[in-house]
Amino acid sequence: MATHLVIGDPHCTPKASNDRLLWAGKFAHDLKPDTIVCRGDFASMDSLSSYDHGNNSFEGRRYKKDVEHVHDALEQFNKGLNGRRPRKIMLLGNHEDRINRTVDEIPELDGTISTDDFKFKKYGWEVHEYQIPVVVDGVYYCHNFPTGVMGKPISGDNIGRALLIKNKVSST
């Protein structure tokens, strides 16, 4: 039987230490999972947030700082793994997708910024696009499962039940 370690939404940001990724890597080393799945939002990408853009609190956020902080977090995680090489799957989330949305809004940035800037593959991760499920040992993983014509995430009081009813598979 395969063991999966699931990491949900780390939201790496220059405002927070990456020590927790070192600890997570050490935990993964000790647990010895066959597969590690990060369910997305590894990066917070505060520099591309649309929620408080234009406010004084936004000043100081920079794309380059966000990306460099993600690189450091990936290095810390691998350091914690201490040579272990389980399969690592990175599902892109809506925070990584901020890059794609920014390029859609400002086409001049096409080819200048992209999710490839995170270099997840360099750090040993398989990368899967936002809202595209991946199946590992019969379990479906996705940052959020889109539903309906608009592709909005499944939501409500009992998301687990809704996932089973709509997808009819084990999913997380």
Predicted regions and their residues:
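Active-site metal-binding loops of divalent metal-dependent hydrolases
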Residues: G8-H11, G40-A43, N94-E96, N144-P146, ...
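Residue-level marker for buried hydrophobic side chains located in beta-strands
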Residues: H4-V6, T35-C38, M90, Y140, ...
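N-terminal active-site segment of His-dependent metallophosphoesterases
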Residues: M1-E75, G83
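Conserved catalytic scaffold of divalent metal-dependent phosphoesterases
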Residues: H69-V169
